[in-house]
C-alpha cells in the first residue's frame, strides 16, 4: 500500500512541479493504431492453437472439453462469456504461472495467421468441391459435405496396403493421437465451438480410436467476423523536428471528421496510468489522482529549453531520480520519464548525483562493456541468460522464448529441481561447443607429411613467433610464420582421375611456399581382387621415392604419373612401373616390379590409412576429402570443378581469427608445439561420425509426459499421446550397466548418459548393435543402456526368442549381471540358450510387451520393423540404414560428444549444489532435465559480471511468488535513451505476466552535450484481451500521446517488427508535420499490416558464397509466380512479400533455374523434398520468418555464371511481367516489352503533404514536356493515404502508368533513426532490389524538382559503362563559396580533382548496376561508414561520391540541373531541370522559393487543385447517391465474392 501511495505522490510531484515556459493549454491527443488485413477470429480458437503449441494432447483434451460443455461455445451471448468459458476449460490443463502468458498471446493475436491459413485451405477446398456446408470433411481425394455423406464414405473400406497420399499435410496440422500412422486420412473442417462440430468429431474420434483413420482437424467458420484484427507489439515515436527550413504545406487544413476513438481525452488510461483502477484501489487519493490526470492531459505550449552545461549530467540525474524508488513503481516512473523525456528534462535537473552513484555507474558500465560488450546508450535484456538487443528484439519472438523457457521451468519444478539449483541449470549455456566444427586428431602415422614448416630449410627466413599472427596485413593475405598452424590433410584415391586436380593444387602450395603443411592419406577402399595390385603399387612407389629422395619428390612423382597417363585414365601398376623406371634410370623394370609387390619393404602404411579413414567416417569412396587442422571441409568443394583453392584460403582466414584470439589471450605461446595445441582443443574427437556430431536436423524425444500406470489396459495405452507413451515406457524401463556405471553426487547415484537401443535381435545387424552398446557399457563410466525390441518376428511366441529373453533379462536381472548374461547370448547366438530361473516368471508377459513396444517404435518413432535406432540422452541418432555401422567406438564418441556439449556442465552444477541433490534425484530425473534443457538451446546464454555494484544504481524486484518457479530477468539500460523507451514497457509487461526476479541496472552515458532523447514514445501492448461493458470485445490497443506540448513540430514514425510492412490507410493530417496549435484538435492515424516478409540468406553449397544475382520467386500452387527478388552478395540476403498461408519458393525460370537447383533449406515451417524444384514455406505467425537456403550448380554448369554478358533473359516472366500493373492495363508481356523499348521509368520519393504536393507538380511538369510514355515508381513506405488515393485519378487525367514499390530496410544493415535519413538511404542503397528485374534503366527525380525538357534525352544517354550518371554541383554562384564543403578537407583530397555530384537527378543503368554488384558495394561501404554518426551527413549523395573510385559516376552536363542556391542566374534559362535546393544562407521555405523562382509553378499548382476539387465533388456526389440507394431497401443482403488476390494499380 505504501508503495502505491509513493507511486501516486511521486508522479504528482513530477507532473505538478514541472516548470513551465508559458501558459498551459488543453493538449489534444495523438493516436495511432495498426490493423491486420485479416479479420478477427474467435478467441477460443486462439486458445486452442496456444495449447497445440504446448502439446498435441492438450489441444485434443481442450477439444474434448469444448464438445462436452453444457452450452455450445458459439451460442454464448457475448464474447466475454465465450472467452471465460474457454479459459475455465484450460485451467485444468495449464498451470497457474502459464495462464497470464496464454492471456497475453491471445491478446496479441499472434496465432491468428495460422488460423487464417486453416481458413484459406478450407475455402480453396470448399469452393473447388461445391460444398454448401461450412462444416465438411475431406476423405482422401473426396469431399463429404454432410454428416450422412461422411458416414457412407467411411463405410467403404480402403484397399488393403494402399496408402492415402491424396491429402497434403502441414506442420501445423492437428492429428488425433494414436492415428498418425493409419492409412486412411480424414480432414475435418469445422468450428469446434459449433454444435455441428460435435456430431462430426464424435464419429471421427471413434473411427480414429478403432485404428481405421488418421483424423486431422482444421478450423473453419460458418460466419466470419468483419472487424480487422487489431495488432500490438510495436512502438510509435514522435520526433521533435527541426524548423530550420519550413516543411509544412500551406494548404487549408482538412476536417478530421469523426474518429473511431471519440472522446479520447476522456479515456481513463492516460500516459500509461489507468486512473479508473487507481481510484478503485486508492479511494483516499481520488482528488490527487484527478489533479494528476488533469495535469497529464494539459501540455505546455513549449518544451523548456536547457543551457548547454545543463545537458551534462542529464542521464545520471535520470538514474538518480529512478533509483530513489524501489518496487514495481520504479518501472512506471521510468516509463513515464523515458517516454516523455523532452518534457521532463528540466525537472530532472533538481536531482542530485551523489559521488557513490557516479562511481558505481562508472564501475558497472566498464564491467558490462568488458564482459558483455554492452555500453550506453545501448540497452540489453537478459532472460535466464538469453540476450535480447533492445534495438532489434520484437515482442512476438520474445514471447516464443518465454513460452519455451516456461516449459523448462515447469519441467524442473515438476521434477523437484528448484531454488538455486534450478537457476543454475537454467543459466547454463549448452550451445558454445556446437558452434565449432568437430575435428579429428591428425597426429597419426597414417598421415604422410610432405613438408614441415617448422623444420624444412626453405622456410628458415620466416618469423618463428606466434605473435606475428597479430601483425596487421592487407586483407586476404596469409601470414607466413614458421609454425605448423595450418595443416592440410588430403585423403585421396591416388589412382582415380578425381584426385588429380587437388594433388596438383597441393603441389603448387608447396612449390610456392604457402604457409600450409601438407599431408596425404591414400584411400584404397575401392580395392578389389582385380585392382589390388595397383593400389599396393601406388603406395609402395610413393614410399620408395620418399625414402630415396624426399616427400616433396614423391608428391611430384604423383603429378608426373598424371601428366603421363592423361586426365581421365585410371592409373595402373604398369603406369607406375613405367614412370618409376623413367625417374630412376638405374632401376630395372623387374626390380621396380619387385619393390611394388605386396609385402615388399615399401609396402607399409596401408592398414594405418584404412583405420584412419574408418575413424573419419567419410562415406564417398573414391572422392577426395580434405581436413584443415583436422576439421573436414565440405566434400563438394574438394572437386576438380570447384574452386578448391578459394575454399581453402577462406577456411584458413577463419582459423587465423581463432588463432589470433588464442595468442592474444596467452593460450598459444612460442613455447607450445603448435600441432599439439591444435589437437588438444575440446572439439577434437577420437573419431568422426556425422550421425553423432552433426548439428543439422537434430531431433529430441519428448520425455516430459505423464506416465500411465496400468500397463494391462492396452486400449488406453494406444490412445496415449506420444509424449505420455514415452513417459510410460521410461517409467517401466530397466537398464544394463557395468562396474563403473554410476557415480555418487550428494545422496544420488547417477548415470549421466542414458542410451536406448532399438533393434531386432533376430537380425545380424540388430545383434551387432546391441553387442557394441553392451561392450561399451562394460568399459564406460556413468552410462546405462536399455534395449527396446523392434520386431514383428513370427518366432516371438517362442520362449527362446532372443528379443524376449534379452528384454526379460534386462527387466529382472541386476544391471551388471544382465550385461554379462546377454553378451554371452549375443556372441554365441546359434548355441542353445539355457534360460536362467530368474527369468521364468517374467517370460510369460514378454510376448505382449514386444507387441506394445513394436507399436511404440512404429507410432512414436516411425520405425519400420527390425529398423535400428540409437537414442542418447533423448536425442535421436538414426534410424540407421541397413549397411550402417555403429560400433563401440561410436558409442564412446557419443559419450565424449555428450560430455563436451552438456553433461560435464550439468555435472559441475550438481556438484556445486550437492546439498540439494537427494535420493529422489535419479538418472530418470537427469534424463528429463536433458529433454527439457537441450531442445531449447538455440541461443547462447550469458552470465552477468560477478563484480557488479548494486548500492546506488540497481533496482531489485523479487519474484511475486517465491514458492513457484521464476524467471531471472536482468535489464541493462540508460534511462535517458531510446533503448529505455522500448525496454521499459516490456519490463512492466514481464512483471505482469511472469513470476520473475528482475534486476534493473542503470548505466547512463556519463556526459552529454545535447538533449539525449529528442522524441516522445509509446509502446502498444495489452496483457489481456479487454471487453466492453456489454461483453463485446473492445476495439483493441492503440498508441496514445496526451499532454504533449502544442507548439513543437513533430514527425511520426512507427517502430514495427522487422518482418512487418505497414501502410498508412487513414490519416487526415500530415504525419510528417504535426503541430497541435495549428491543428487545434485530436490527430488520429490508422495503418494496415500489408505484408509479412519472408526473409532469408542464400548460399552456394559448394563454395559457401552467396550466389549473387540469383533470382527467386514466391507464389502459391495456383499462382506460382507472385513476387520475385534477387539474392544480394551482402550475406546472401533476400526478402519477399507474403501474407498468412502456404507458399512455394522457387528459382526463377531462366538462368537461375538453368544453372542452380535448391539443395537444402533450414528454417521453421519449411519443407523441401529431395530433388524437388520448390520449397514449401508456411507463413503462420506474426514473428519473423528467416530461412537459410542452399543451392547447388547443376551437373555441367560448374563454370556458368549468373551475371555473364549473355544475361538477356532478365526480362522473362515473373511477378513484374505476369501482372499488368500499369494504369492502362494490357497484357503483362506487352507491358514489359513496352517498358524495355519505349516507356521511361521515373523514380521518386516523398514524405509529408508538402513534398507530396511538390511531387505532383514535378510529375505534371515532366509529363507536359515528355512525348514518350512514362511510368512513375514511388516508394510506398512513406506516402500518405491522400496521395495514394489521388494517384489513380491523376494517372487517368494525365495518361501515365505508375507502380508503388516497397523494400524493408534489412535488419543486418545499420539502421538510421531519423526518418529523413532513412528516406535518403532508400534513394541509393536498394536500387538493385527495389525494382522489378525487367526494368533496365530508371531516372530519379527529386520531388521538389521542375522538369523543363523531354526527359527521354536523359533516358537515352550513353553512360559510357558507368552504372549511373549524376549532375555535379554548380560552382557559378560565388557568394556561396564558403558553404561548398566538397572543396575543402576530406572531400577535396578524396575526390582528387573530380567534382562532387548532387543527388536531385540521376539516371541508373540497372542492368549494369546489378552486373557489377554496385548495390552490394554501396551497402558494404555504407555499413562501414554509417557506424560513425559524423559520416555521411548527406547520405544519398555522400555515399556515391565517396565510392566514386569503386563505382564510377558519369558526370552529366551542368544544364541538366540548376538550383538557385549554387548556380548563377545566368544559367537559369538553359536549365533542363530546376531543383528547389535548401539555401543555408537564407533558410527560405520551399513553397516561397518555388513560387518566386519558377514562373510556371503556380499554374501547375492551380491545375492540380482544380483536378482535386473536381474529383472530390464527384466522390461526394457519388457518396450521396449511394446513401440514397442504401436507404431504399437495407433489408436485402448482398454477398460479394472478392478474389483472394486482386492487385491494385501498380502493387501486389
Swiss-Prot record:
Biased region (Basic and acidic residues) positions are: 243-253, 1512-1523
Q: Where is this region: Glucosyltransferase?
A: 1227-1548
Instruction: Quote the subcellular location field of this record.
Output: Endoplasmic reticulum lumen; Endoplasmic reticulum-Golgi intermediate compartment
Q: Which UniProt keywords apply?
A: Endoplasmic reticulum, Glycoprotein, Glycosyltransferase, Signal, Transferase
GO MF terms held by the record: UDP-glucose:glycoprotein glucosyltransferase activity; unfolded protein binding
> In terms of domain of life, where is this protein from?
Eukaryota
EC number(s) per entry: 2.4.1.-
Say where the protein is mainly found: endoplasmic reticulum
Q: May I ask which residue range the UniProt record assigns to the signal sequence?
A: 1-22
Enzyme category, top tier? transferase
User: Where are the annotated segments for Disordered?
Assistant: 243-265, 1512-1548
Residue span of motif Prevents secretion from ER: 1545-1548
Q: Which Pfam families match?
A: Glyco_transf_24, Thioredoxin_12, Thioredoxin_13, Thioredoxin_14, Thioredoxin_15, UDP-g_GGTase
The record's catalysed reaction(s) read:
N(4)-(alpha-D-Man-(1->2)-alpha-D-Man-(1->2)-alpha-D-Man-(1->3)-[alpha-D-Man-(1->2)-alpha-D-Man-(1->3)-[alpha-D-Man-(1->2)-alpha-D-Man-(1->6)]-alpha-D-Man-(1->6)]-beta-D-Man-(1->4)-beta-D-GlcNAc-(1->4)-beta-D-GlcNAc)-L-asparaginyl-[protein] (N-glucan mannose isomer 9A1,2,3B1,2,3) + UDP-alpha-D-glucose = N(4)-(alpha-D-Glc-(1->3)-alpha-D-Man-(1->2)-alpha-D-Man-(1->2)-alpha-D-Man-(1->3)-[alpha-D-Man-(1->2)-alpha-D-Man-(1->3)-[alpha-D-Man-(1->2)-alpha-D-Man-(1->6)]-alpha-D-Man-(1->6)]-beta-D-Man-(1->4)-beta-D-GlcNAc-(1->4)-beta-D-GlcNAc)-L-asparaginyl-[protein] + UDP + H(+)
The protein's assembly and partners: Monomer. May interact with CG7484/Sep15.
What family name appears in the similarity comment?
Belongs to the glycosyltransferase 8 family.
Protein name listed in UniProt: UDP-glucose:glycoprotein glucosyltransferase
Annotated source species: Drosophila melanogaster
Gene that this sequence comes from: Uggt
Amino acid at each position: 500500500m505504501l508503495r502505491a501511495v509513493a507511486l501516486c505522490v511521486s508522479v504528482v510531484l513530477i507532473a505538478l512541479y514541472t516548470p513551465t515556459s508559458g501558459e498551459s493549454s488543453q493538449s489534444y491527443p495523438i493516436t495511432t493504431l495498426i490493423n491486420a488485413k485479416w479479420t478477427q477470429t474467435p478467441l477460443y480458437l486462439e486458445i486452442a492453437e496456444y495449447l497445440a503449441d504446448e502439446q498435441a494432447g492438450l489441444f485434443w483434451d481442450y477439444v474434448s472439453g469444448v464438445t462436452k460443455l453444457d452450452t455450445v461455445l458459439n451460442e454464448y451471448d457475448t464474447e466475454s462469456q465465450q472467452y471465460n468459458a474457454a479459459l475455465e476449460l484450460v485451467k485444468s490443463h495449464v498451470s497457474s504461472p502459464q495462464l497470464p502468458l496464454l492471456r497475453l498471446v491471445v491478446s496479441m493475436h499472434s496465432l491468428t495467421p495460422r488460423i487464417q491459413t486453416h481458413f484459406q485451405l478450407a475455402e480453396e477446398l470448399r469452393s473447388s468441391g461445391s460444398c454448401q456446408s461450412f462444416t465438411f470433411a475431406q476423405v482422401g481425394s473426396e469431399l463429404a459435405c454432410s454428416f450422412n455423406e461422411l458416414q457412407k464414405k467411411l463405410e467403404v473400406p480402403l484397399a488393403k496396403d494402399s496408402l492415402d497420399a491424396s491429402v497434403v499435410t502441414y506442420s501445423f496440422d492437428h492429428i488425433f493421437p494414436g492415428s498418425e500412422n493409419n492409412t486412411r486420412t480424414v480432414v475435418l473442417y469445422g468450428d469446434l465451438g459449433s454444435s455441428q462440430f460435435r456430431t462430426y468429431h464424435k464419429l471421427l474420434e471413434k473411427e480414429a480410436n478403432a485404428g481405421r483413420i488418421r483424423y486431422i482437424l482444421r478450423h473453419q467458420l460458418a460466419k466470419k467476423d468483419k472487424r480487422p484484427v487489431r495488432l500490438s507489439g510495436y512502438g510509435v515515436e514522435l520526433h521533435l523536428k527541426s524548423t530550420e527550413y519550413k516543411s509544412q504545406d500551406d494548404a487549408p487544413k482538412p476536417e478530421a471528421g469523426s474518429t473511431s476513438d471519440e472522446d479520447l481525452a476522456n479515456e481513463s488510461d492516460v500516459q500509461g496510468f489507468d486512473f479508473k483502477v487507481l481510484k478503485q484501489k486508492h479511494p483516499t487519493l481520488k482528488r490527487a489522482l484527478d489533479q494528476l490526470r488533469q495535469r497529464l492531459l494539459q501540455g505546455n505550449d513549449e518544451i523548456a529549453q536547457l543551457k548547454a552545461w545543463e545537458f551534462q549530467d542529464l542521464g545520471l540525474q535520470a538514474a538518480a531520480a529512478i533509483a530513489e524508488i524501489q518496487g514495481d513503481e520504479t518501472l512506471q516512473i521510468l516509463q513515464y520519464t523515458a517516454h516523455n523525456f523532452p518534457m521532463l528534462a528540466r525537472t530532472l535537473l533538481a536531482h542530485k548525483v551523489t559521488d557513490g552513484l557516479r562511481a558505481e555507474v562508472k564501475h558497472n558500465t566498464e564491467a558490462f562493456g568488458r564482459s558483455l560488450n554492452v555500453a550506453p546508450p545501448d540497452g540489453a535484456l537478459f532472460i535466464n541468460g538469453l540476450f535480447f538487443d533492445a534495438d532489434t528484439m520484437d515482442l512476438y519472438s520474445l514471447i516464443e522464448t518465454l513460452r519455451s523457457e516456461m516449459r523448462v521451468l515447469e519441467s524442473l519444478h515438476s521434477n523437484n529441481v528448484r531454488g538455486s539449483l534450478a537457476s543454475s541449470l537454467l543459466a547454463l549455456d549448452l550451445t558454445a561447443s556446437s558452434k565449432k566444427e568437430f575435428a579429428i586428431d591428425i597426429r597419426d602415422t597414417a598421415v604422410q607429411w610432405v613438408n614441415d614448416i617448422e623444420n624444412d630449410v626453405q622456410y628458415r627466413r620466416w618469423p618463428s613467433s606466434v605473435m606475428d599472427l597479430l601483425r596487421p596485413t592487407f586483407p586476404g593475405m596469409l601470414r607466413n610464420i614458421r609454425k605448423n598452424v595450418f595443416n592440410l590433410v588430403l585423403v585421396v584415391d591416388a589412382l582415380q582421375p578425381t584426385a588429380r586436380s587437388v594433388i596438383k593444387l597441393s603441389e603448387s602450395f608447396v612449390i610456392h611456399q604457402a604457409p600450409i603443411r601438407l599431408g596425404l592419406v591414400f584411400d584404397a577402399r575401392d580395392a578389389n581382387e582385380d585392382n589390388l595390385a595397383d593400389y599396393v603399387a601406388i603406395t609402395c612407389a610413393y614410399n620408395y621415392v620418399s625414402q630415396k629422395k624426399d616427400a616433396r619428390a614423391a608428391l611430384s612423382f604423383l603429378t608426373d604419373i598424371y601428366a603421363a597417363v592423361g586426365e581421365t585414365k585410371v592409373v595402373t601398376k604398369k603406369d607406375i612401373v613405367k614412370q618409376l623406371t623413367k625417374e630412376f634410370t638405374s632401376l630395372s623394370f623387374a626390380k621396380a616390379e619387385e619393390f611394388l609387390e605386396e609385402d615388399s619393404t615399401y609396402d607399409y602404411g596401408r592398414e594405418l590409412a584404412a583405420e584412419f579413414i574408418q575413424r573419419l567416417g567419410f562415406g564417398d569412396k573414391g572422392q577426395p576429402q580434405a581436413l584443415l587442422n583436422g576439421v573436414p571441409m565440405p566434400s563438394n568443394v574438394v572437386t576438380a570443378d570447384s574452386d578448391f583453392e578459394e575454399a581453402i584460403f577462406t577456411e584458413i582466414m577463419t582459423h587465423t581469427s581463432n588463432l589470433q584470439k588464442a595468442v592474444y589471450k596467452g593460450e598459444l605461446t612460442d613455447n607450445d608445439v603448435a600441432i599439439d595445441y591444435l589437437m588438444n582443443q575440446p572439439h577434437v574427437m577420437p573419431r568422426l561420425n556425422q550421425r553423432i556430431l552433426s548439428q543439422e536436423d537434430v531431433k529430441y524425444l519428448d520425455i516430459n509426459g505423464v506416465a500411465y500406470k496400468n500397463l494391462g489396459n492396452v486400449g488406453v495405452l494406444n490412445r496415449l499421446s506420444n509424449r505420455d507413451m514415452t513417459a510410460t515406457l521410461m517409467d517401466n524401463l530397466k537398464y544394463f550397466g557395468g562396474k563403473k556405471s554410476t557415480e555418487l553426487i550428494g545422496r544420488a547415484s547417477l548415470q549421466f548418459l542414458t542410451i536406448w537401443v532399438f533393434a531386432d535381435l533376430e537380425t545380424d545387424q540388430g545383434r551387432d548393435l546391441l553387442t557394441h552398446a553392451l561392450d561399451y557399457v562394460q568399459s564406460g563410466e556413468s552410462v546405462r543402456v536399455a534395449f527396446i525390441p523392434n520386431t514383428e518376428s513370427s518366432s516371438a511366441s517362442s520362449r527362446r526368442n532372443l528379443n524376449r529373453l534379452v528384454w526379460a533379462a534386462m527387466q529382472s536381472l541386476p544391471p551388471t549381471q544382465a550385461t554379462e548374461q546377454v553378451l554371452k547370448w549375443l556372441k554365441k547366438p546359434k548355441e542353445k540358450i539355457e534360460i536362467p530361473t530368474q527369468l521364468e516368471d517374467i517370460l510369460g508377459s514378454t510376448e505382449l510387451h514386444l507387441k506394445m513396444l513394436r507399436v511404440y517404435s512404429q507410432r512414436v518413432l516411425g520405425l519400420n520393423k527390425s529398423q535400428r535406432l540409437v537414442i542418447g540422452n533423448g536425442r535421436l541418432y538414426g534410424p540407421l540404414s541397413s549397411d550402417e555401422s555403429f560400433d563401440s567406438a561410436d558409442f564412446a564418441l557419443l559419450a565424449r560428444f555428450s560430455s563436451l556439449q552438456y553433461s560435464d556442465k550439468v555435472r559441475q552444477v550438481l556438484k556445486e549444489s550437492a546439498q540439494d541433490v537427494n535420493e529422489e534425484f535419479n538418472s530418470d530425473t537427469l534424463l528429463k532435465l536433458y529433454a527439457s534443457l537441450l531442445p531449447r538451446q538455440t541461443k547462447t546464454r550469458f552470465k552477468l559480471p560477478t563484480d557488479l555494484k548494486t548500492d546506488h544504481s540497481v533496482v531489485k524486484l523479487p519474484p511475486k511468488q517465491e514458492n513457484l518457479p521464476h524467471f531471472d530477468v536482468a535489464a541493462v539500460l540508460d534511462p535517458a535513451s531510446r533503448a529505455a523507451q522500448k525496454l521499459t514497457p516490456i519490463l512492466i509487461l514481464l512483471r505482469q505476466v511472469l513470476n520473475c526476479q528482475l534486476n534493473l541496472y542503470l548505466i547512463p552515458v556519463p556526459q552529454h552535450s545535447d538533449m539525449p532523447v529528442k522524441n516522445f514514445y509509446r509502446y502498444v501492448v495489452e496483457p489481456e484481451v479487454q471487453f466492453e461493458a456489454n461483453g463485446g470485445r473492445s476495439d483493441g490497443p492503440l498508441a496514445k500521446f496526451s499532454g504533449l506540448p502544442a507548439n513543437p513540430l513533430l514527425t511520426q514514425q512507427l517502430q514495427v517488427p522487422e518482418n512487418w510492412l505497414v501502410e498508412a490507410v487513414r490519416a487526415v493530417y500530415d504525419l510528417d508535420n504535426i503541430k497541435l496549435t495549428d491543428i487545434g484538435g485530436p490527430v488520429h492515424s490508422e495503418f494496415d499490416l500489408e505484408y509479412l516478409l519472408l526473409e532469408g540468406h542464400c548460399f552456394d553449397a559448394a563454395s559457401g558464397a552467396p550466389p549473387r544475382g540469383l533470382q527467386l520467386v514466391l507464389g502459391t500452387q495456383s499462382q506460382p509466380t507472385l513476387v520475385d527478388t534477387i539474392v544480394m552478395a551482402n550475406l546472401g540476403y533476400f526478402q519477399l512479400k507474403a501474407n498468412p498461408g502456404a507458399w512455394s519458393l522457387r528459382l526463377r525460370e531462366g538462368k537461375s533455374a538453368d544453372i542452380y537447383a535448391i539443395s537444402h533449406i533450414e528454417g521453421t515451417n519449411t519443407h523441401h523434398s529431395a530433388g524437388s524444384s520448390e520449397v514449401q514455406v508456411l507463413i503462420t505467425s506474426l514473428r519473423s520468418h528467416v530461412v537459410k537456403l542452399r543451392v547447388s550448380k547443376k551437373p555441367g554448369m560448374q563454370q556458368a555464371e549468373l551475371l555473364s554478358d549473355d544475361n538477356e533473359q532478365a526480362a522473362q516472366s515473373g511477378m513484374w511481367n505476369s501482372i499488368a500493373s500499369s494504369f492502362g492495363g494490357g497484357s503483362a508481356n506487352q507491358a514489359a516489352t513496352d517498358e524495355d523499348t519505349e516507356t521511361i521509368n521515373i523514380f521518386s520519393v516523398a514524405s509529408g503533404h508538402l513534398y507530396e504536393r511538390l511531387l505532383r507538380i514535378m510529375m505534371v511538369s515532366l509529363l507536359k514536356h515528355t512525348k514518350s510514355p512514362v511510368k512513375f515508381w514511388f516508394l510506398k513506405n512513406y506516402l500518405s493515404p491522400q496521395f495514394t488515393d489521388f494517384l489513380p485519378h491523376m494517372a487517368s487525367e494525365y495518361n501515365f502508368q505508375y507502380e508503388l514499390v516497397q523494400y524493408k530496410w534489412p535488419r543486418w544493415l545499420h539502421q538510421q533513426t531519423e526518418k529523413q535519413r532513412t528516406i535518403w538511404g532508400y534513394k541509393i542503397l536498394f536500387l538493385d532490389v527495389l525494382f522489378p528485374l525487367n526494368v533496365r534503366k530508371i531516372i530519379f527525380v527529386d520531388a521538389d524538382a521542375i522538369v523543363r525538357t523531354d526527359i527521354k534525352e536523359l533516358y537515352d544517354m550513353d553512360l559510357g559503362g558507368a552504372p549511373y550518371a549524376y549532375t555535379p554541383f554548380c560552382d557559378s554562384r560565388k557568394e556561396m563559396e564558403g558553404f561548398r564543403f566538397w572543396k575543402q578537407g576530406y572531400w577535396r583530397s578524396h575526390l582528387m580533382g573530380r567534382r562532387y555530384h548532387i543527388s536531385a537527378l540521376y539516371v541508373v543503368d540497372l542492368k549494369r548496376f546489378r552486373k557489377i554488384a554496385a548495390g552490394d558495394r554501396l551497402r558494404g561501404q555504407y555499413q562501414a561508414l554509417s557506424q560513425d554518426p559524423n559520416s555521411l551527413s548527406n547520405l544519398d549523395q555522400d555515399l556515391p561520391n565517396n565510392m566514386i573510385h569503386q563505382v564510377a559516376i558519369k558526370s552529366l552536363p551542368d544544364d541538366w540541373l540548376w538550383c538557385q542556391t549554387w548556380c548563377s542566374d545566368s544559367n537559369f534559362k538553359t536549365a533542363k531541370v530546376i531543383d528547389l535546393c535548401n539555401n543555408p544562407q537564407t533558410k527560405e521555405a520551399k513553397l516561397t522559393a518555388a513560387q518566386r523562382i519558377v514562373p510556371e509553378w503556380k499554374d501547375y499548382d492551380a491545375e492540380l487543385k482544380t483536378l482535386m476539387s473536381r474529383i472530390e465533388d464527384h466522390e461526394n456526389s457519388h457518396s450521396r447517391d449511394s446513401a440514397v440507394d442504401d436507404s431504399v431497401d437495407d433489408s436485402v443482403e448482398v454477398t460479394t465474392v472478392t478474389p483472394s488476390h486482386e492487385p491494385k494499380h501498380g502493387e501486389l
